[in-house]
From Swiss-Prot:
The active site is at R210, K234, H306, R309, H332, Y341 (o-(3'-phospho-dna)-tyrosine intermediate). Residues 169-354 form the Tyr recombinase domain. It is found in: Cytoplasm. Keywords: Cell cycle, Cell division, Chromosome partition, Cytoplasm, DNA integration, DNA recombination, DNA-binding. It comes from Streptococcus pyogenes serotype M18 (strain MGAS8232). One of its GO terms (biological process) is cell division. It comes from the Bacteria. Its main location: cytoplasm. One of its GO terms (molecular function) is tyrosine-based site-specific recombinase activity. FtsK is required for recombination. Residues 16-121 form the Core-binding (CB) domain. This is Tyrosine recombinase XerS. The keyword Cell division applies. Site-specific tyrosine recombinase, which acts by catalyzing the cutting and rejoining of the recombining DNA molecules. Essential to convert dimers of the bacterial chromosome into monomers to permit their segregation at cell division.
Length: 356
């Protein structure tokens, strides 16, 4: 969603939250957590607080009145009842036949709660320099993770990557072929944003940055002479990221039309812009996800921006066989996360089996 709309929704949630959640929000904003992450966490807290009231685990008449002692004295059994509620509640998605939330969604909810409890029991300080309370019930609640070997995950992901010549073929398809099947009205919209869309896709494929990192790019963060961009990684760390040379032409073409086409002024700092009723705005994550999905589905298979990150990582490992280099490019502090890419490009095992 647009940044302005996102901030409006955040303010709506903040208006109904207890004071300690507002403290938490302010603390995480200073790290900084992205507005998208904080918005998702606030949604999860509302879901949890609504359940506390429905389950009569608090006498508070509204969410803002739920006090700290309620959270402090919740039992493991209470939290397990909440998880059961999430698993069995009717789905609000009219396109889904499932009765409850997916395990991935449940894990996300529990992750948000764990973050809040850790803040309240370890990170925050009251007037005496102590946390608000010490009992962290979330440490007793286990999450169920999807069981899958790295080899299995790699094989599933591989089908959704644009490896080898497909990276440039995808860009070439959007540039030269996609327009041919559009109506005249659709062509007009496509042509307006063509350079920008190609620049975004090229940057994701050439750098492997996260979607949030691309969204938050400002003009000052992009150095096309050096082909380096400055991003804010998870945890608020600033990082310099190298960008593959094939993206340069696409980025330059976008910059050549950015000011005129999106009516950008000096105060419009965002690198990737959208324009609505003559007003330029930072392009948001949801719009980029939809854009990438639209083009990729027409080319081969619908993918997310994160799969473009996987594509870059896999191609880089295939070229260098260096997990350290790949982990640095992706902004990971450990090579453990990059084990996946060794499985995606590891054809030696298959070749050995073929020779049996």
């Amino acid at each position: 969603m647009r940044r302005e709309l996102l901030l409006e929704k955040i303010e709506t949630y903040k208006a109904i939250m207890p004071w300690y959640v507002l403290d938490y929000y302010q603390s995480k904003l200073a790290i900084p957590y992205s507005f998208t992450t904080l918005y998702e966490y606030l949604k999860e807290y509302k879901r949890f607080f609504d359940w506390l009231m429905d389950a009569d685990l608090t006498q508070a008449p509204k969410i803002a009145d739920i006090d700290l002692s309620t959270l402090e004295h919740l039992t493991k059994k209470d939290l397990e009842a909440f998880v059961l509620y999430l698993r069995e509640r009717p789905s609000l998605n009219t396109y889904s036949t499932k009765e409850g939330l997916s395990q991935t969604t449940i894990n996300r909810t529990l992750s948000a709660l764990s973050s809040l409890y850790k803040y309240l029991t370890e990170e925050v300080e009251n007037d005496q320099g102590e946390p608000y309370f010490y009992r962290n019930v979330m440490k007793k609640v286990s999450t169920k993770k999807k069981k899958e070997t790295l080899a299995s995950r790699a094989e599933n992901i591989k089908q959704k990557l644009f490896l080898g010549d497909e990276t440039l073929a995808f860009l070439d398809y959007v540039d030269k072929e996609y327009e041919q099947k559009l109506s005249n009205r659709a062509k007009s919209s496509f042509r307006k944003n063509k350079e920008r869309d190609l620049a975004i896709i090229a940057l994701l494929l050439a750098s492997g940055v996260r979607l949030s990192e691309a969204v938050n790019l400002d003009l000052k963060d992009v150095n096309l002479n050096m082909m380096i961009i400055e991003v804010i990684r998870k945890g608020g760390k600033r990082d310099s990221v190298n960008v593959a040379g094939f993206a340069k032409g696409y980025l330059e073409s976008y910059l050549a039309v950015r000011q005129r086409r999106y009516k950008a002024e000096k105060q419009d700092l965002a690198f990737f812009l959208t324009e609505y009723r003559g007003v330029p705005n930072r392009m948001d994550a949801s719009s980029i996800e939809k854009m990438v999905g639209k083009y990729s589905e027409d080319f081969k298979i619908r993918v997310t921006p994160h799969k473009l990150r996987h594509t870059l990582a896999t191609r880089l490992y295939d070229a260098t066989k260096s997990q350290v280099l790949v982990s640095h490019q992706l902004g990971h502090s450990s090579t453990q996360v990059t084990d996946l890419y060794t499985h995606i490009v590891n054809d030696e095992q298959k070749n050995a089996l073929d020779n049996l």
